[in-house]
Amino acid sequence: MRIVEDEREEKLAKSVVLRSYWNQNDMLNLQEYLDKWSDIDLEDIRKRMQKSEFIEILSPNLKMVWNPEKLESNFTQEGDILWLKTPQSWVHWIMPDGFKLEQTHPSLLQLAVDLLLRPWHEEVKAPLDEGREKGVNYALSYSAGNDSSAAMQLMPEDTILGYHERNFNSNLNHDNAHRMINHLRKNREVLTVESNHEHLRRLRGKPTGFSTDYAASVHLVLLADFLDLRGIAFGTPIDNTWLAKGLNFRDFSKSKHLQFWRDRFAEAGLELIHPINMISEAGAMKICKESSFIDFMNSCMRGNGVKGCGKCWKCFHKNGPLGRQYDVKSREIYSFLKKRPLRSGMHAIWATKVMNIKHLLPDYESILDSDLGWWEQYYPPGLELIPSELREHVENKLKQYLKPMNTPYVMETINLYLE
């Protein structure tokens, strides 16, 4: 898009363009150019977009029918926008300059469709096309929160950080993430890709969110050839690896989940990496507390860009132990503390202990009265899950922050269903 060259009139021209998109209800272009032209002060439009509950499912200037036989054929590209035709709607991503659909291996497109539609469509489970060779770079599916920031600290410094940004209106607020990302960008690049793919669950009567455990990385899967990726890392802590939902121990190394998704990513020439599988959310906090970015990092997704909302579960168990404000009487926090099995399991128990409010969990008194120092240490067997090329680097970084758990491992005895 060409904007007038006269610097005195440039802001006025940009303002006219943005207000035109608003008046035409062209939310996709409006969001794209609001981001590109951050120097334009249109807070009224920005705030109205955030508060609106209306989700417009956009579509390209092309008529297509879902093809279940050739999944990669359901993609098309218009400028920087990559489109995917699904059986129910269109999904889009605003891709970086230079991305070209035709230069993307079919297996990556097929894997992306699988990650988005697996819960509802059997045809996406077919074998992927062969032939994609591994690249040389690593990427991290980055959320700007506690766990993925700890993963960032353990991965090599040249790891590509890829942030997925939901670009339709919901109760999620990106302000806290933006603050962290803007801070990081002073020293390294952070790639942000906007998409509406989280609406797919909503079409099926479920809360807005990710279709599968690894759908948060779809933007990086689609960009794997563009970025020459060897593997994609996730900030998944012990709470969701060696402990199932933070409640009971399992041998994650032999789990069907890990074996299946490792193989599935490998079909597309990608390594699936869990750099913090061996540490808890508490361990991740300890790593982040020793970083220069701790004052900019906030896991709350409803905050105002400076602090958390103080009323959500993330503010309780992620911000509370950092000494940040939370309201234990808020509806969400109060109800989750009463729910059984306990949400966030071991980490919630640890959090109540370090915040000196263990009276809120009287039925876990025996655990609360025990030594929970091991929860802030790392589980050595988890290092074996790190790809060999990365293992030494991750282990050396890890030892700078945390001590190993002692044997016999207390964690291997955890089963909160029995409490």
Model-inferred region functions:
Residues 143:
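Metallo-beta-lactamase
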Residues 91-117:
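N-terminal cap/recognition module
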Residues 12-26, 32, 37, 46-72, ...:
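Nucleotide-activated chemistry modules centered on ATP-dependent adenylation/adenylyltransferase
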Residues 74-80, 94-96:
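ATP-binding N-lobe of GHMP and related small-molecule kinases
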